[in-house]
Amino acid sequence: MASKTFDAGVQDYQLTYWTPDYTPLDTDLLACFKVVPQDGVPREEAAAAVAAESSTGTWTTVWTDLLTDMEFYKGRCYRIEDVPGDKNAFYAFIAYPLDLFEEGSVVNVLTSLVGNVFGFKAVRSLRLEDLRFPIAFIKTCGGPPAGIQVERDKLNKYGRPMLGCTIKPKLGLSAKNYGRAVYECLRGGLDLTKDDENINSQPFQRWQNRFEFVADAVDKATAETGERKGHYLNVTAGTVEEMMKRAEFAKELGQPIIMHDFLTAGFTANTTLANWCRDNGMLLHIHRAMHAVIDRNPNHGIHFRVLAKCLRLSGGDHLHTGTVVGKLEGDRASTLGFVDQLREAFVPEDRSRGVFFDQDWGSMPGVMAVASGGIHVWHMPALVNIFGDDSVLQFGGGTQGHPGGNAAGAAANRVALEACVKARNEGRDLEREGGDILRDAARNSKELAVALDTWKEIKFEFDTVDKLDVG
């Protein structure tokens, strides 16, 4: 029976959008929200309100509802579950018909699902925990410009993680000194170097000058070592037009890879750039600057696994994922859950990793996970074990903080990486025997011995804020 508020012309959402008997279709887009309702609001009503506001609903009855098939287009909350260890919150599972979304548009999906409902008064807090994209939608998205295998073929690097470094200091260097730092790191043994997220085109270093000096450094290191090298040239800019101009110049210089800050620049810019990279044979490295503003609060926002899925659809060949062991936030199980979403063709539901739905990616190429942030040689065994071969391990301060300089720091990391990969291939337990593996390798590498001594006391032992809700 309708409530008094419904009689007064205000929607009782539960009557229309709470459908516990509904069985989701393979073509439905599924969402899991963590909901904390306002005091006095029943769970079913709060969940239905989320389904309504993120699909077809409005606050009152309108006569134009009669001009379309609301039963076909509405979002449906089909299940509610308790959140382990939190009596105030619950999970709301909502199914959305595919026709609510523009083909190939991550922008439209996010606008619908999180664009307005997060300010809704019926809920105290709201978090989008996971999405299940149907294959029918995935097939309309371009995805990564190259993918993992094509990147390995382009760079001729197989059987191990790639080794990288963010140039430090991230701001303040002249273009010439910046290029010199790139050259030393690549000559010393790194595969890739990187612009930091906030180096664009500042007065101390205009982008075109940086690109030219970096290209010279990459070409020189490639010629001297006989290995294919690269540097992520950050093309992020204030306008899409300027971004594309920078991308075109990187291509003219013969560089293999460019970089983009996908959250601060936006998904429209990112998809535009990814499509261009696909058409022009360029690799695309993605930085997640601003992600923690959105995903770190365990009760409100969007979990990073959702952002990672959206990035795979929008397009990128690398994505920063945290390190588990370094200075940045990252629960191990949860991190592995969204790393799987980046790389695998099919990811089964696994609540122990925060995966709420089976996700079939079809034939969409994978994205390399990038571990970066407060890591050094002592972390190498754990990083190789956690992230596996299809990853980029980036040591910024852990390369350039070496007492012997950038080239020595790069050499130390390269020796450590190859020692860990060799030990793993021999069946050794990297996380249990890692210290011994590194010390043995250091007997034949002065650079590694110095690095091990330099960073032997450095740890980041803060607890994770955003932990998995498991019983």
Curated annotation (Swiss-Prot):
Stated EC number for the protein is 4.1.1.39
Subcellular location(s) per record? Carboxysome
Its cellular-component GO annotations read: carboxysome
Q: Which GO terms describe its biological process?
A: reductive pentose-phosphate cycle
pH profile: Optimum pH is 8.0.
> What do we know about what induces or represses this protein's expression?
Induced by growth in low levels of dissolved inorganic carbon (at protein level).
Which catalysed reactions does the entry list for this protein?
2 (2R)-3-phosphoglycerate + 2 H(+) = D-ribulose 1,5-bisphosphate + CO2 + H2O; D-ribulose 1,5-bisphosphate + O2 = 2-phosphoglycolate + (2R)-3-phosphoglycerate + 2 H(+)
State if Magnesium is listed as a keyword: yes
Note describing how the cofactor binds? Binds 1 Mg(2+) ion per subunit.
**Which amino acid positions bind Mg(2+), per UniProt?**
K194, D196, E197
Q: Which cofactor does it need?
A: Mg(2+)
Q: Which keywords does the record carry?
A: Bacterial microcompartment, Calvin cycle, Carbon dioxide fixation, Carboxysome, Lyase, Magnesium, Metal-binding, Monooxygenase, Oxidoreductase
Family listed: Belongs to the RuBisCO large chain family. Type I subfamily.
Its subunit composition reads:
Heterohexadecamer of 8 large chains and 8 small chains. Forms a CsoS2-CsoS1-RuBisCO complex.
Anything else known: Encoded in a cso-type operon. The basic functional RuBisCO is composed of a large chain homodimer in a 'head-to-tail' conformation. In form I RuBisCO this homodimer is arranged in a barrel-like tetramer with the small subunits forming a tetrameric 'cap' on each end of the 'barrel'.
**What is the designated name of this protein?**
Ribulose bisphosphate carboxylase large chain 2
